[in-house]
């Protein structure tokens, strides 16, 4: 027993400063050794399922992209089914504060109401717009871990320009951006106890009480919710809905990429340390794997994904193909050196391989398979990237790079 305690102390003390791994990351079957990554062959981006070469933008948009999205829908994230009864969507601005952050911005609290014969549910959507910028403004929409009805979204009194949750909204306002937040647990519980109590119930036909194997899991429900946020933004005269960047961190980074891949109304996507089922390649099996994900979070993906546990090479897709489905709209991937659970190398390679499609469509992408040096961001490219030192979080350095990327790709001439 004493030996075990001593081992754990040495293990914890020996971690680099800033490392904040959870217990799951110490599982003995988790691989962090680059020399143990298996040989793999990625599914081709520019060859159709019937073997036809994809050589034109038209062939990509009309043939290959729909094929890939269909595979991700039915095998990874799950399809949103046709509801038995149409879902009505309506918006209600329940509160408006034109003096938010000492007059720097206006805050709107919006209820997005969803209902049909099966029931009703609401999302609490937040919209912040800078007061000193000509409207309509471009904006960021963030998949939030923080409850949008909590005081996390109040202005901080101790850190000017920040929310109580630490987000530097003052910097966004100074740069002329709006900021929006959607809390996906309004729509779907993220564990097996709460999973069945949310949006899924509105879509069931009579007699169904659980999603089919190919139907939507948590991440797909999150993506659907963000698109309802976009529905509202299309009605808000203060927001330029043609210049919306969708973003998210960690689990919400996974949802972000799936949101942007499907919903072309989003002009730009930012994935922050999204890892497995986000930007990282499945086939590398480095850090978190499909097995780890579906064991701990069985409903994040659709149940068809379970078939590929320890058989990732049998998947007809990998995550570079998800990023490619966002093209030609810009996408940005953020990694960090100590976030080994998210496989930063796999995240970069995914973005690098997706660049092939961006170039086909007349855009620009990552030029080298070598990961850039720390704090050497790639910004002047339709596929952007940076890696910094440290662990699993969004730091001020990251926020600033996200804004820099948006300045290049969203700001009007």
Regions found by a protein language model. Give the residues of each.
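Sec-dependent N-terminal signal peptides
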Residues: 4-13
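N-terminal pre-domain segments of enzymes
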Residues: 19-80, 405
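N-terminal cap/lid segment of alpha/beta-hydrolase-fold proteins
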Residues: 79-138, 146-148
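Cap/lid segment of the alpha/beta-hydrolase catalytic domain
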Residues: 135-238, 275-278, 282-284
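Mobile cap/lid helix-loop segments that gate and shape the active-site cleft of serine hydrolases
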Residues: 206, 271-322, 347-370
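Primarily recognizes the serine-hydrolase "nucleophile elbow" in alpha/beta-hydrolase
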Residues: 221, 228-288, 292, 296, ...
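Conserved strand-to-loop "acid loop" that flanks and positions the catalytic carboxylate
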Residues: 327-344, 388-390
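C-terminal catalytic histidine-bearing segment of alpha/beta-hydrolase fold enzymes
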Residues: 351-413
